[in-house]
Amino acid sequence: MILVGIAVLILLAVFAILYYKQKEKFVVVGKFVEPIPSNPGQDFTLLPMDQTYTFADPVPDTATAFDVVLSRFTDKKAPADLLKGATFPEAAPYTDSEVENISKLALSRVKGPDAPVLSFISVEYAAKGVDNKKNTHYDIAFMVYDQVKNFSLKLVLVAVLDAKNKLWIKKFSSFNSFTPKDKGPKGVENIDETPLAEFIPDFVQFSRLYKDNANV
C-alpha cells in the first residue's frame, strides 16, 4: 500500500509540473494562418511572405465609433520577417514601469481632431513573452482617463516590440469592444462612480482561444 501511495504521489507531481509548464507559455501574436474556431472574428490570413502581411485584428462591424478611432493606431501591415521563423514565446518577467511605458507608448499614438484625449492611470493586467528572434510580446489591460468626457476607460493592447525597439500594435481597443450588443465601450463609468467595471480577462484566455494551436 505504501508503494501504491508513493506511485500516486509521483504521478500527481508529474501532472502538476506538466500543467504549470504549459501555463507558463502564451501564444505568438499574429502567427496563425487559419482563423481560430472558437473565435471566428479573428482572421490571421497571411499574404505572400516576401511582402508585408496582415497584422492588426480586423475591426468588426459592431465596433463602436470610439474603437474605430482607436483602430487607426494599430499597425495594419508588418514586415514579413517580423515573426517569420519565430518560436512560441516563453513567458518572461516584467516590471511595472516596463508595461506602463509600453502602454504610454501606444497611448501616445492617439492623436487627431476626432481622437479622444486619454491620460494613463494604471495597468490592471499584463503578460509578457520573448521569442527566439528577441521579439517581446505584450498583452496588457490598462486604465485611462478621458479628460473630455470625464470617463475612466479600460483599454486592451496586444503588441510586439521588435529587436530594434519598434512597437508593432496588433490590437488596441476598449475592453470587450467586440460584443455586438454594446451600446458603448464596456469597462466605462463616470470617474466619480465606484467601483469600476469588473475586470474579466476574456481577451487573454489564450488557453481557450488557441487550444487548437497548442503545439504550434
From Swiss-Prot:
Primary localisation category: virion
Source organism superkingdom: Viruses
Role according to the record: One of the minor capsid proteins that constitute a network internal to the major capsid proteins and outside the lipid membrane. The minor capsid proteins glue and stabilize the capsomers.
Annotated signal sequence range: none
Binding partners and assembly: Interacts with the major capsid protein.
Record keyword Cell membrane present: no
Name of the molecule in the record: Minor capsid protein P6
Any single Gene Ontology cellular-component annotation: viral capsid
Subcellular location: Virion
Stimuli inducing this protein: Expressed in the late phase of the viral replicative cycle.
Disulfide bonds: none
Record key words, sorted: Capsid protein, Late protein, Virion
